[in-house]
Design a protein with these regions (language model features):
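N-terminal membrane-anchoring alpha-helices
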Residues: 2-71
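N-terminal cap/lid segment of alpha/beta-hydrolase-fold proteins
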Residues: 70-112
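Short alpha-helix in the alpha/beta-hydrolase fold that links the catalytic acid
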Residues: 133, 262, 271, 285-294
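Conserved alpha/beta-hydrolase
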Residues: 134-156
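Alpha/beta-hydrolase active-site loop
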Residues: 160-181
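Hydrolase active-site cap/lid region
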Residues: 200-256
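Short beta-strand/loop motif that positions the catalytic acidic residue
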Residues: 268-270, 275-277, 281
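Catalytic histidine neighborhood in serine/cysteine hydrolases
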Residues: 293-311, 318
Length: 332
């Protein structure tokens, strides 16, 4: 009987060992796949094909709204390109805390002005995608800094920071402006991942030079947006996929996607925040904006634009969009 128990115990241990090995191999394989896909600089996470549209509960944008958005987008792009070619500008760079070089462009409206705006682009995007926002700030008398986010466009870096690493990079850009002008009054504007960045930064100990934040289409947390996209793109459950992703991302990219939460950070914000979102956003659901707004423990306001998709509020109703921003900034 004792011999039989030993055999059973041995078999059990072997079975457990096999399960552990399979789990480790699966975690390494699946985790690496999704890290490569989602946050590796050379990954193809920017090619978004929705396989489960039912997981994204948004209203369809009507044809008239689409026409308005496309026409305004075309006009804004042309005007912004003309603006960027005529205004004084210079290339600048900073070293991030982890040693990589970050690059950006400053557009100088008035060298003697204290008014500055830092404009941040979105996931796998470029400064050119948001240059029209810089143009509008410039028209209001702001000097403008538009950086390339880490692992995007002109900046170095192997892994996209999803806002969490970028909040530290943003501090470097803020410090650069303050070094140039110790009396600078700085506005932070971010779109999509850029919005997540400024919201995540809001909970940090920001210099008093930072006067306000504008977050357009920001997500609540890295975990939440990846969970939403895993369902939409692959029709996959959160567990165990994201858990495997989390483990590998911690090792390779050096940040925890569970810790990377804009929702938690805005609870500690002392900086006024304006939240903007389109009610037809099929990438970052509108409810995330509502949750962020409710959680923010600071002076705040929000603008929801009807029939606007992801970061398209500025094209759907440009006058409303910019009037709201500068009205908010005028009241802080």
């Amino acid at each position: 009987m004792e011999e039989k128990n030993k055999i059973l115990l041995k078999r059990l241990l072997i079975a457990v060992l096999i399960i552990v090995i399979i789990s480790i191999v699966a975690t390494i394989g699946i985790g690496n796949y999704f890290v490569n896909y989602a946050i590796l600089r050379t990954g193809n996470g920017g090619d978004r094909e929705v396989k489960n549209a039912d997981s994204i509960a948004v209203a369809n944008i009507d044809n008239e709204a689409e026409k308005i958005i496309e026409e305004n987008k075309k006009n804004e792009k042309q005007l912004a390109n003309e603006w960027s070619e005529t205004i004084e500008n210079k290339k600048v760079e900073v070293k991030a805390k982890d040693g990589i070089t970050l690059r950006g462009t400053q557009y100088i409206k008035d060298e003697s002005s204290n008014k500055w705006a830092i404009i941040l682009h979105g996931y796998r995007s470029t400064p050119n995608s948001i240059i029209s926002i810089g143009m509008h700030f410039s028209k209001e008398g702001y000097n403008v800094l538009i950086p390339s986010m880490r692992a995007c466009s002109e900046s170095d870096g192997e892994y996209i920071g999803m806002g969490w690493l970028d909040k530290e990079d943003l501090q470097c850009w803020i410090n650069l402006i303050i070094k140039q002008n110790e009396n600078a009054e700085i506005i932070l504007h971010g779109s999509s991942m850029g919005a997540a960045t400024v919201l995540m930064a809001s909970g940090e100990d920001l210099p008093t030079n930072v006067k306000a934040i504008v977050a357009d289409s920001g997500y609540t947390s890295v975990w939440d947006i990846f969970a939403s996209e895993a369902k939409a793109r692959f029709n996959l459950p959160t567990f165990p996929i994201l858990n495997m992703f989390e483990i590998v991302a911690n090792v390779r990219a050096n940040y925890d996607i569970k810790e990377a939460s804009a929702l938690e950070q805005v609870k500690n914000s002392k900086t006024p925040i304006l939240f903007i979102h389109g009610d037809a956003d099929d990438f970052v659901p509108e409810y995330m904006c509502e949750e962020l707004y409710e959680a923010a423990n600071c002076k705040k306001d929000k603008l929801i634009i009807h029939d606007a998709g992801h970061t398209d509020s500025k094209y759907k109703e440009p006058e409303t969009y910019y009037n709201k921003i500068f009205e908010f900034l005028g009241n802080i």
